[in-house]
Amino acid sequence: MALPIVAVVGRPNVGKSTFVNRLAGERDAIVHDEPGVTRDRTYRPAFWQDREFLVVDTGGLVFDDDSDFLPLIRQQAELALQEATAAIFVVDGQAGPTALDYEIAAWLRQLSLPVLVAVNKCESRQMGQVQAAEFWSLGLGEPYPISSIHGSGTGELLDQLITYLPAGETLPEAPEIQVAIAGRPNVGKSSLLNALIGSDRAIVSPISGTTRDAIDTVIEHGGTQYRFIDTAGIRKRTHVAYGPEMFSVHRAFKAIHRSDVVLLVLDALEEITEQDQRLAGHIADQGRACVLIVNKWDAVLDKDTYTINAYRDRLYQRLHFLEWADALFVSAHTGQRLEKIFAAVDAAVEQHRRRVTTAVVNDVIQEALHWHTPPATRQGRQGKIYYATQVATQPPTFAIFVNDAKLFKENYRRYIESQIRQQLGFRGTPIRLLWRSKKPREAAELVAR
């Protein structure tokens, strides 16, 4: 059965993200002293008394501000409450009840949902009881004094919470594919995610950088589970101020690191930038499978049968780190070619996890040597390849045993890699070659195994 969901709501800077981190046992959500810093709703698994549930961290609620984001944040909170089994309303015990707290409480009372009031920042147990008592006036039942920083009081709160959650064991999750959606700000990452999953799950706004956190969404398609990680837009370092956005860039790189495959989203209306190149290099360095997604293709004017080919040529020229990745020309707005993304992801992951027998690898190496022997040095020393074998997957990694690795310069190493790709494919994934020096006797022992 699906895990029950608990929505965490409240006004800005009452400690919602710190509270969620406490429940989840990790420092994952961005915590920073800025109203509305958690713009999207983020899901974290939590456990209490052998019970598992998901905690949804929503943005700080404000009802009377002119900010462009605040209506979107309220909408995200509403969506979280619609799918929740219970809610936790976090308030600030040091500040006492505010007018905004009363507004939020009135809004929550209209919902047919159990609501617990967590009075945060109650660092003293004795004073906490006094501070919490003020919040009876919200009309939501007993307030629970807690300290998200120290963890005090959360046990009593959670004991009450699990009485509202359905009993039952959760089934083990099916194997899933982790997909990071990455790219510069405003290339359409969240719009792409929304189109793929069919709901306004992530905030979408024309203002650059509206998705600050790395958000997970799990869906099932064609019998396979996909965990989509929608990352914040990645800017040049000189354009990233200290604060939440800097943390989000770090989070985006973490999302790439924990993914199986990265959808690198590009804007068809803009040229490939230096930041696109740096991001492509990072994906390759991390050894992640990748699919290039050229978004907004519907907005490209005067297209003909040669337009895609011309763009693809420029794309691979600029992003030579990812010349092994397939490119899809799509529109999140119209849905053009979106159905091909799942197949491309599946194919890339299959190649990323692929293993080839040692006999096949050595057949490819011998064929490559037949057409192009390693060049000799000025002193007449000739490079020799004794043996090759695949030693790892994700990404596919091959050990090449040679007489002296220093004799094989970059050009010849690229030639061997290109021959492996030409003969064996591995489209959609980087491959790595480990050049290992071995004495002839050691090499003979390896071959004999």
Curated annotation (Swiss-Prot):
Indicate the segments forming the EngA-type G domain, all copies.
4-169, 177-353
Any one Gene Ontology molecular-function term assigned to this protein's record: GTP binding
UniProt domain KH-like: residue ranges: 354-439
Q: Origin, by domain of life? A: Bacteria
Instruction: Specify whether Nucleotide-binding is a keyword of the entry.
Output: yes
Q: Where does GTP 1 bind?
A: 10-17, 57-61, 120-123
Which residues participate in GTP 2 binding? Answer: 183-190, 230-234, 295-298
Q: What does this protein do?
A: GTPase that plays an essential role in the late steps of ribosome biogenesis.
Against HAMAP family, the record matches this protein to:
GTPase_Der
User: Subunit composition?
Assistant: Associates with the 50S ribosomal subunit.
Protein name (Swiss-Prot/TrEMBL): GTPase Der
